[in-house]
UniProtKB/Swiss-Prot annotation:
InterPro entries: Motility-assoc_lipoprot_GldH. This is Gliding motility lipoprotein GldH homolog. A lipid is attached at residue 20 (N-palmitoyl cysteine). NCBIfam families: GldH_lipo (TIGR03511). One of its GO terms (cellular component) is plasma membrane. It holds the Pfam family GldH_lipo.
Length: 162
């Protein structure tokens, strides 16, 4: 009887959270371990309504092995017809007192990071998004070879309010 109740609560929770996420169009994650500076996290987007406007986010899950207060990323969106948009981004990961900005229980925190707003995917075909870490230690020219503490990298598309 107790396990049936636990299963019911689990299923109810999943339904509750999935029904509250009406803005979500795309939300995928890639698990990583010791993110190498040359490794790309890739996402392919297909069948996105070209008449709508969207907001884009990068989702990062980190644990206490992440030793930095910020995160530098290089992103690239490849459009179906060949156009490419590249960005170098910096995000704060902690408050000034060192407390994580992300939400979550235990060691793992999740940060939903604004990437772009009011984006139209007006070309038909597949879009490709790549995300690469670009972290360096203070004073170093070379990037950090293996970035510890990032457990998952995600890409999310939401319907825009505009």
């Amino acid at each position: 009887m107790r396990s049936a109740f636990s299963v019911f609560i689990f299923i109810f929770t999943i339904i509750l959270f999935s029904s509250c996420d009406k803005k979500r169009v795309y939300d995928e994650y890639e698990s990583i371990h010791e993110w190498h500076k040359d490794s790309l996290v890739n996402f392919e987007l297909d069948n996105i309504d070209s008449t709508k406007v969207y907001d884009l986010f990068i989702n990062i899950r980190n644990n206490n092995d992440y030793r930095y207060s910020n995160l530098f990323l290089i992103t690239e969106i490849k459009f179906p017809q060949g156009k490419v948009i590249s960005d170098t981004l910096e995000y704060d990961m902690t408050k000034p007192n060192g407390e994580w900005l992300g939400i979550g229980f235990g060691d793992v925190k999740e940060s939903k990071l604004w990437y772009k707003e009011n984006v139209k995917f007006d070309e038909s075909g597949k879009y490709k998004v790549s995300i690469q870490q670009a972290m360096r230690k203070n004073g170093d020219v070379d990037g950090i070879q293996e970035l510890e503490g990032i457990t998952d990298v995600g890409f999310r598309i939401e319907k825009s309010d505009n």
